[in-house]
Amino acid sequence: MAQDGRTRQQRAVATRAAIIDAAAGEFDEHGYLGTSMDAVAERAGLTKGALYFHFTSKADLAGAVIARQHEVSRQYGEAAATRGTTPLEVLMWMSQGLASQMIHEVVVSAGIRLSTDTAAAGVARRNPYTDWMQVAAELVRQGIEAGEIDSAWDPQLIGRVVVPAYTGAQTVSDVLADRADLYDRLRELWTVLLAAIVTDRMRPEIPRLVALIAPLATED
Amino acid sequence: MAQDGRTRQQRAVATRAAIIDAAAGEFDEHGYLGTSMDAVAERAGLTKGALYFHFTSKADLAGAVIARQHEVSRQYGEAAATRGTTPLEVLMWMSQGLASQMIHEVVVSAGIRLSTDTAAAGVARRNPYTDWMQVAAELVRQGIEAGEIDSAWDPQLIGRVVVPAYTGAQTVSDVLADRADLYDRLRELWTVLLAAIVTDRMRPEIPRLVALIAPLATED
């Protein structure tokens, strides 16, 4: 009995994950308004009844895609953190990781698109922005402690500036070049942002730091 | 005869403008996918046939809203240019003007929303970004000449960074605060961007410059 119960629960978890993947594909291709519950059910190979058992509305589903995207991004962020040996390196690796994921992971691409989609105004989507602002602010705080970032800066202010600037770089890269120049745009953005915030001893390091924002050798 | 002809043409121009206004209202409220030609015709008080006489598709209409928004923004930009007495002041006044328009002019709000709407991928919308990058780059070039901006910077690079950063600030302000904090976000953004690019003699002027980005006394 207990094992049956667990198996059923595991199956439900797997179905839920498959639905989120299918929904991500639809949202990524057709935007929020262009996606229907019918299309998601069909893509996931489920009846509409089975879909509604897991998600009661499209807004609910979009919220789950954004939450999943944020979870995937956070995991990658933690992995990125282990690549960097200083706060600024970690910040660069996180930028690299987010860009890489945006290009390669449909759930990330879909989550980011939903997060900037006017039509998705009713969807829960504020947390990713405010969470990343906190992450960036914390790294800036560490950067100040490590003597990499000028202590005159308020870490919270830098967090509030960096996250929207990053968001805009990916939006404009999407509109102008289908994200083909995303790494270039991010390296240019960080070249300017770092020039504003680093201490004099870190200034010569800016080209080395921004060069970390590039496709990994393992990427196509 | 000639006079009749002109009258008919003037009427056509007025109808076209009324359609663009109606479309802007619909796009602003419902996004690209959520807007129908029927709703635009109804809002403009026209038959669908009359609407199609002027615009052959929704993408055509969205392109016209973006073009009109860009025209309005450029006009305001030129007016803003006359308020500033130095290149950096002009850059700040332009930022103020764009923010003010985004809040007060439906066609601008709608145009910007269409310009960042994933669902509007088929719509002509690259020009506003590339045009503003050129405008910003030209002001940076003038700022270098005037000794306000460090000559080590490539004006084109700064243009490519500033415009997406500005775009992202408005997107995030829209998502997090319905644009209520747009001026605050822009002042913070420029505090960082100016710190990166100004010459040492202009550094003490940064607070005065960013303070120009605020609601005008004539605004509500």
Predicted regions and their residues:
Chain A
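A short His-aromatic
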Residues: 52-55, 59
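Phosphate/oxyanion-binding loops and surfaces in catalytic or ligand/nucleic-acid-binding neighborhoods
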Residues: 72, 97-101, 105, 165-172, ...
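C-terminal peripheral helix-coil segments that are non-catalytic and often amphipathic
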Residues: 2-3, 130-134, 138-146, 176-220
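Amphipathic alpha-helical interaction segments
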Residues: 18, 89-97, 157-164, 184, ...
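Hydrophobic alpha-helical connector segments
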Residues: 64, 75-108, 155, 159
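Short secondary-structure transition hinges
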Residues: 96-153, 157
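Basic, helix-initiating cap at the start of DNA-binding domains
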Residues: 1-30, 34-46, 59-63, 72
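Key DNA-contact positions within bacterial/archaeal DNA-binding proteins
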Residues: 49
